């Protein structure tokens, strides 16, 4: 059996929801306190046992490559000043086996994954979406990517991460139609549906940003016609794959943080900061003070 060694991180999106910040800075480089969002993804991959990572980028994404490259001047300066803890943090971002390829035009997630065909070869691989951060406030939790890899060791089949979402939100996700009940959190899947209307959704089990796929997906993606949004949808290709190979779905029970929009990004930043040793106490005190001020502002005043 071929071991899962490789991961793909699609990072070619334009990041329009975060303009003007993303005009010159990659969305994936926006920090949660002091760490870019893409670094959380890379750390999850490494913690799971992934050996090689391909980042699929687009225009104005050079900052991602720079972040994971060495910076001699910075490293020399930190070493000379004896700032060893900071030097260690910098070193952790450079000792990684990362590769980069550019998606020339944003034609959808399926097309971004297809750019990795030569990198992956004939091996199973993981796709990790940068908008979904998993259990970042729980260092002891088993990474979701690791859970998918363990499932593959048992089934030798593609496995997609899913999570229950409010029924009214299903139109924002790909959704699975499960076959029967889950066995230890693992579902057999009948069909995959991309962004159904709530009244048409086969379940509340939404696909979240982790996929373990067999290499046969590439042949399907090469023939895939554009779907929702006139883009090549990975969900559609997985549904086609499911007709010739079994595809499973792993239900994620941990905490998922969606950093794909402003409010989700702010919530994630607050939750992570409340666990950050350098800022958590000050932030807690500030939130308590702010909460009292907001409650006071709600009290109606009565004029005589």
Swiss-Prot record:
Per UniProt, the keywords (alphabetical) are: Nucleotidyltransferase, Transferase
GO biological process terms held by the UniProt record: biosynthetic process; UDP-alpha-D-glucose metabolic process
The record's section on SUPFAM superfamilies has:
Nucleotide-diphospho-sugar transferases
Q: What is its EC number?
A: 2.7.7.9
Spell out the disulfide connections. none
| An MF annotation (GO) of this entry | UTP:glucose-1-phosphate uridylyltransferase activity
Note the superkingdom of the native organism.
Bacteria
Q: In which pathway does it act?
A: Carbohydrate metabolism; nucleotide-sugar metabolism
Reactions catalysed: alpha-D-glucose 1-phosphate + UTP + H(+) = UDP-alpha-D-glucose + diphosphate
Among Gene3D superfamilies, the record links this protein to: Spore Coat Polysaccharide Biosynthesis Protein SpsA, Chain A
Q: Does the keyword Hydrolase apply?
A: no
| Family recorded in the similarity comment | Belongs to the UDPGP type 2 family.
Q: Which PANTHER family match?
A: UTP--GLUCOSE-1-PHOSPHATE URIDYLYLTRANSFERASE
Question: What is the recorded name of this protein?
Answer: UTP--glucose-1-phosphate uridylyltransferase 1
Natural source organism: Streptococcus pyogenes serotype M1
Annotated gene: hasC1
């Amino acid at each position: 059996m071929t071991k899962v060694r490789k991961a793909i991180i699609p990072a070619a999106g334009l990041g329009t929801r975060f303009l003007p910040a993303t005009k010159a800075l990659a969305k994936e480089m926006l920090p949660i306190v002091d760490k870019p969002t893409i670094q959380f993804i890379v750390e999850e991959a490494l913690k799971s046992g992934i050996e090689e990572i391909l980042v699929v980028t687009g225009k104005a994404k050079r900052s991602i490559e720079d972040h994971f490259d060495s910076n001699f001047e910075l490293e020399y300066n930190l070493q000379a000043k004896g700032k060893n803890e900071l030097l260690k943090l910098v070193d952790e971002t450079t000792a990684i086996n990362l590769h980069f390829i550019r998606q020339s035009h944003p034609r959808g997630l399926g097309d971004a994954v297809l750019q990795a065909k030569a990198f992956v070869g004939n091996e199973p691989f993981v796709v990790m979406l940068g908008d979904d951060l998993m259990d970042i406030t729980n260092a002891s939790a088993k990474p979701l990517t690791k859970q998918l890899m363990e499932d593959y060791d048992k089934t030798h089949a593609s496995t997609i991460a899913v999570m229950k979402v409010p029924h009214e939100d299903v139109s924002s996700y790909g959704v699975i139609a499960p076959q029967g009940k889950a066995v230890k959190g693992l579902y057999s899947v009948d069909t995959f549906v991309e962004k159904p209307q709530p009244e048409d959704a086969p379940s509340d089990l939404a696909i979240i940003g982790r996929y373990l796929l067999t290499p046969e997906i590439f042949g399907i993606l090469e023939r895939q016609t554009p779907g929702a949004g006139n883009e090549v949808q990975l969900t559609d290709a997985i549904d086609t794959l499911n007709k010739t190979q079994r595809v499973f779905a792993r239900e994620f029970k941990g905490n998922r943080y969606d950093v794909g929009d402003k409010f989700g990004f702010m919530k994630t930043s607050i939750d992570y900061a409340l666990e950050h040793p350098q800022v958590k106490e000050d932030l807690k005190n500030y939130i308590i003070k702010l909460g009292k001020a907001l409650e006071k502002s709600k009290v109606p005043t009565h004029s005589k």
